[in-house]
Amino acid sequence: MRKTVLYLSAASLFLSSYTLKNDKEYSLAEEHIKNLPEAPEGYKWVVNEDYTDEFNGKRLNAAKWHAKSPYWTNGRPPATFKAENVSVKKGCLRIINTVLSPTEGLDGKPGDKYRLAGGAVASVKNQAHYGYYETRMKASLTTMSSTFWLSNRPVMKEIMKGGKKIKTWSSQELDIIETMGIIRSVNPDNPWNKTWNMQMNSNTHYWYQEQGGKRTDNTAKRSDVVSYMTDPSAEDFHTYGCWWVDANTVKFYYDGKYMYTIKPTTKYTDTPFDRPMFIHIVTETYDWEKQVPTAEDLKDKDKSTTYYDWVRAYKLVPIEE
């Protein structure tokens, strides 16, 4: 009987310790709820623990995050992704941009396809759905990107076209923030990118491909008006968030302030953004920025690093829950 009591006491102590740790882990995210958009009548915001992380440990939480994305294993040349460029230190997830020596091929062996490396952290779970997603981030002071977005893998569907049954593939991407700390390439025909490090850059992409055809990118246009941030994205930490309201509506926020709404294309379906996604936290090179970082540009590790203070996710539940 005494052994049974001891076992029960030990179990109770373990459960109490676990509960206290769990409560502490998400207490900041819970406190942050007051800063979210007002919940619809009859609902309240609660923390979605699967995609919430304060990055206060000594290493990346492998139960929540892949240090190198299994969904997108190689970046856009000339930069690839390296797990060793990802770390957690002093309360931040850090992705450092580096020079590869020697340069690499697609297989990671010596080659000439990649000469730079960034990072691509991805959530382990891929069921992020309607809700609020936000990060507090400071971009690197480089011509490589600092980003926070959601996406999913293509699904196949058969349709009738021209009296024949053909296969189609579709996937979605929800870009909450894509920015760079420095802009060096300015296209006179596309001057919008001149102030890209000062703009709140968000998009929704509906990728679509028919059997025998090419994949097309259907990007929803948000507005002809550029939405500016308070200062350049590499100057300080700011929050970047979105409320994925439903299959047709996404609202975007900067430092808790509403910026704009994007309506994904309904060219192929009435409910384009109805599928769950995973989260991506990525630094990469863009094809339109021709002046990518040099070894000299990346000598300063602090300037070469994108810092993510936290990632927080929330979902709506009926108030009676």
UniProtKB/Swiss-Prot annotation:
Keywords: Glycosidase, Hydrolase, Signal. CDD domains: GH16_beta_agarase. Its EC number is 3.2.1.178. InterPro entries: Beta_agarase (IPR016287), ConA-like_dom_sf (IPR013320), GH16 (IPR000757). Substrate binds at residues 72, 76, 173, 178, 284. Residues 31-319 form the GH16 domain. The keyword Hydrolase applies. Residues 1-20 form the signal peptide. One of its GO terms (molecular function) is beta-agarase activity. The keyword Magnesium does not apply. The active site is at residues 173, 178. It catalyses: Hydrolysis of beta-D-galactopyranose-(1->4)-alpha-L-galactopyranose-6-sulfate linkages in porphyran. GO terms for biological process: carbohydrate metabolic process. Cleaves the sulfated polysaccharide porphyran at the (1->4) linkages between beta-D-galactopyranose and alpha-L-galactopyranose-6-sulfate, forming mostly the disaccharide alpha-L-galactopyranose-6-sulfate-(1->3)-beta-D-galactose. Some longer oligosaccharides of even number of residues are also observed. Inactive on the non-sulfated agarose portion of the porphyran backbone. Gut bacteria supply the human body with energy from dietary polysaccharides through glycosidases that are absent in the human genome. Beta-porphyranases, which are active on sulfated polysaccharides from marine red algae of the genus Porphyra, are present in marine bacteria. They are absent from metagenome data of gut bacteria, except from the genome of the gut bacterium B.plebeius isolated from Japanese individuals. Belongs to the glycosyl hydrolase 16 family. This is Beta-porphyranase B.
